Amino acid sequence: LREDTVDFGAIDLDVSGEKTIVDDAEAVEIEMTIDLNASTAERAGLKIHATEDGAYTYVAYDDQIGRVVVDRQANAQGDRGYRTAPLSEAELAAGELKLRVYVDRGCVEVYVNDGRQVLSSYSYASEGPRAIKLVAESGTLKVKSLVLHHMKSIGLE
């Protein structure tokens, strides 16, 4: 179902930095590897379905609790739920976090470290373009690799 691919390579974000990786994403797959040892951010990850009104769903690693989170607190519509997946001591010691994130118009699925943990959540975006942004909160972020695949429609419009 992949239509085209954008390889961003390695990305470094400064303290509390933000980088838009796509201005309007309808259906995408994101493969991202974070260097946990070289990152200092308290929370770092992706703002999904980010719209001009400030709404988004946050897929992030929270260093303070050692978990990957899907946080819908900033959603404009629907439930504002919060899901987490803990990283094991071995995963934390490895110093690397692999995320595979699938996004469509109303859903976010996150596969942590090759599917060892999986998070799935509804994510209803506001009207207008739905950006995806790479974010570092209260520290820096070192991404070893980031690849975005635009996905074809399966024709259920």
Which residues make up each language-model segment?
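Beta-rich accessory regions
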Residues: 1-157
